[in-house]
């Protein structure tokens, strides 16, 4: 018969045994490129080798910084070896000759000299007049009668002859011994002071400090409340009868009290004690004995600077001003002082007018020197000569000026102020004073020494300000 229809598919048989690996097939057609999804972040790699140094960066902007706050005091350094003996300075110019003194009083007469040698015999003089008749002799025996004689005429004696000529003068006698010395004549007037000696060799220039960053200007503070009315002052001295002659000097109290003028002088005005200023890294000092050191207004930056472009700038640079200070204690945290808190730290001063010039006399010992004859004392103090601060800049004080004789001694007699409105004491501020000297050790090598607080006044020279008395 015919073949039957195809039957249904049977069940799958059991898997066969693994066949032998067939030959490698021909390469297939390239597949379609489909971007896959981003894989997960891999683990961090190991540290790579250091790269080559990059090129130098551009220069920074030239911004001047402000001075940092005062740091803590360092440990005292070891004592250095003694310095070598310095060269002897050149002698000063000779002073002008003094005015000749008045002639002394006449001395007592000297002793008589020895008698001179016997003179030569003089010429014979004319015969002198006859002498008086002699006494009668004894009566002789009678003579023999003579012959009659002639009449004899007896004439009268003639007049005396002229005196004989004077004999030749005798030889000069030996000089007598010198008479006793005469009384000393009165002292001549005081000679003029000699010319100033040549200036000393300048000291080494200090290293320039780093400029700090300029701080942002803070907002102006609000005005404080007005202070209470002060008590009335003491009654001043009576006015002098004489007319003032225009001799002006300044007196500094080194406290917050306004000083009074000495007796016999009159006040012109009062103010605040300016010592020196520093601008563009250059310092200029004021003579404390003149009225320029007594400003009637106080500010931490009393000056401004202008350029050739007709532009002026105020309180916008790293400039300084320095003022005589008071004994007020600085804050424990050494923070800069600003605003109304500055008032207790600034010394007051008074400008006075006197009838004559005022000078300072320095003893260079711990004894107060006397005023010259004909001068009166105005005040006594300590011999102040020089001061330096930021950038080793500073100024000196004329020793003839009343400003070189401060009535109070302090190792830090001035305070530093800045244009940003703050003031403080800093470790690079130094004061220089005349030392007390032993007259027996002149022209000898000074003995190095270090004197601590409590004994400082024992090595500082004393001084006195004197004024010429009115005639």
Curated annotation (Swiss-Prot):
Q: What the record says about its domains?
A: Alpha chains of type IV collagen have a non-collagenous domain (NC1) at their C-terminus, frequent interruptions of the G-X-Y repeats in the long central triple-helical domain (which may cause flexibility in the triple helix), and a short N-terminal triple-helical 7S domain.
Tell me the Gene Ontology biological-process terms attached to this UniProt entry: cell adhesion
Biased-composition ranges, Low complexity, are 165-174
Q: Which residues carry this modification: Hydroxyproline?
A: 232, 238
Pro residues: bias regions: 52-61, 127-141, 175-187
Q: Report disulfide bridges, numbered on this chain.
A: 261-352, 294-349, 306-312, 371-466, 405-463, 417-423
Region: Triple-helical region; residue ranges are 1-238
Q: Which organism is it from?
A: Bos taurus
GO CC, alphabetical = basement membrane; collagen trimer; extracellular region
UniProt keywords, alphabetically:
Basement membrane, Cell adhesion, Collagen, Disulfide bond, Extracellular matrix, Hydroxylation, Repeat, Secreted
Residues annotated as domain Collagen IV NC1: 246-470
Q: Where is this region: Disordered?
A: 1-241
List residues traversing the bilayer. Answer: none
State any single GO MF term. Answer: extracellular matrix structural constituent
* Sequence motif Cell attachment site, location on chain: 106-108
Function field: Type IV collagen is the major structural component of glomerular basement membranes (GBM), forming a 'chicken-wire' meshwork together with laminins, proteoglycans and entactin/nidogen.
Name of the molecule in the record? Collagen alpha-3(IV) chain
Q: Is the Repeat keyword given for this protein? A: yes
Q: Cite the location of the cross-link S-Lysyl-methionine sulfilimine (Met-Lys) (interchain with K-452) from the record.
A: 334
Q: Which residues constitute the cross-link S-Lysyl-methionine sulfilimine (Lys-Met) (interchain with M-334)?
A: 452
The record's subunit annotation is: There are six type IV collagen isoforms, alpha 1(IV)-alpha 6(IV), each of which can form a triple helix structure with 2 other chains to generate type IV collagen network. The alpha 3(IV) chain forms a triple helical protomer with alpha 4(IV) and alpha 5(IV); this triple helical structure dimerizes through NC1-NC1 domain interactions such that the alpha 3(IV), alpha 4(IV) and alpha 5(IV) chains of one protomer connect with the alpha 5(IV), alpha 4(IV) and alpha 3(IV) chains of the opposite promoter, respectively. Interacts with ITGB3.
**Entry keyword Secreted:** yes
In its record, the post-translational modification comment is: Prolines at the third position of the tripeptide repeating unit (G-X-Y) are hydroxylated in some or all of the chains.
Q: Which family does it belong to?
A: Belongs to the type IV collagen family.
User: Where, per UniProt, does this protein localize?
Assistant: Secreted, Extracellular space, Extracellular matrix, Basement membrane
């Amino acid at each position: 018969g015919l073949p039957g229809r195809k039957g249904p598919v049977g069940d799958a048989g059991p898997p066969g045994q693994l066949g032998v690996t067939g030959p490698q097939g021909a390469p297939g057609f390239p597949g379609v490129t489909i971007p896959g999804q981003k894989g997960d972040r891999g683990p961090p790699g190991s540290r790579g080798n250091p790269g080559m140094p990059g090129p130098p960066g551009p220069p920074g902007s030239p911004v001047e910084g402000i001075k940092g706050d005062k740091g803590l005091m360092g440990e005292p350094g070891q004592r250095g070896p003694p310095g070598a003996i310095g060269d002897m300075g050149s002698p000063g110019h000779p002073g002008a000759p003094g005015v000749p003194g008045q002639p002394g009083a006449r001395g007592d007469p000297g002793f008589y000299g020895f008698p001179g040698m016997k003179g030569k015999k003089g010429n014979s003089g004319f015969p002198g007049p006859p002498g008086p008749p002699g006494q009668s002799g004894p009566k002789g025996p009678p003579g023999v009668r003579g012959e009659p004689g002639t009449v004899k005429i007896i004439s009268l004696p003639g007049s005396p002859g002229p005196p004989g000529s004077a004999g030749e003068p005798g030889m000069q006698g030996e000089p007598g011994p010198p008479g006793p010395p005469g009384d000393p004549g009165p002292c001549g007037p005081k000679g003029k002071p000699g010319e100033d000696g040549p200036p000393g060799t300048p000291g080494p220039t200090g290293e320039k400090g780093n400029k700090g960053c300029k701080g942002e200007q803070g907002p102006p503070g609000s005005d404080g409340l007005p202070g209470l009315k002060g008590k009335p002052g003491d009654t001043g001295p009576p006015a002098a009868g004489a007319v003032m002659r225009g001799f002006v000097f300044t007196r500094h109290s080194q406290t917050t009290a306004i000083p009074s003028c000495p007796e016999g002088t009159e006040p012109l005005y009062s103010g605040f004690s300016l010592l020196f200023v520093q601008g563009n890294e250059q310092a200029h000092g004021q003579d404390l004995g003149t009225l320029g050191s007594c400003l009637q207004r106080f500010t931490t930056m009393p000056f401004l600077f202008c350029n050739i472009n007709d532009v002026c700038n105020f309180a916008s640079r790293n400039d300084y001003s320095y003022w005589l200070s008071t004994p007020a204690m600085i804050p424990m945290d050494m923070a800069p002082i600003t605003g109304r808190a500055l008032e207790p730290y600034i010394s007051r001063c008074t400008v006075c007018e006197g009838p004559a010039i005022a000078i300072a006399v320095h003893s260079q010992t711990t004894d107060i020197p006397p005023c010259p004859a004909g001068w009166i004392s105005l005040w006594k103090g300590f011999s102040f000569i020089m001061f330096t601060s930021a950038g080793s800049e500073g100024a000196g004080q004329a020793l003839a000026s009343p400003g070189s004789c401060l009535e109070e001694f302090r190792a830090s007699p001035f305070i530093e102020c800045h244009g940003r409105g703050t003031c403080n004491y800093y470790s690079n501020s130094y004061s220089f004073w005349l030392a007390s000297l032993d007259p027996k050790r002149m022209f000898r090598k000074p003995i190095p020494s270090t004197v601590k607080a409590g004994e400082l006044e024992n090595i500082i020279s004393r001084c006195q300000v004197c004024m010429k008395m009115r005639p």
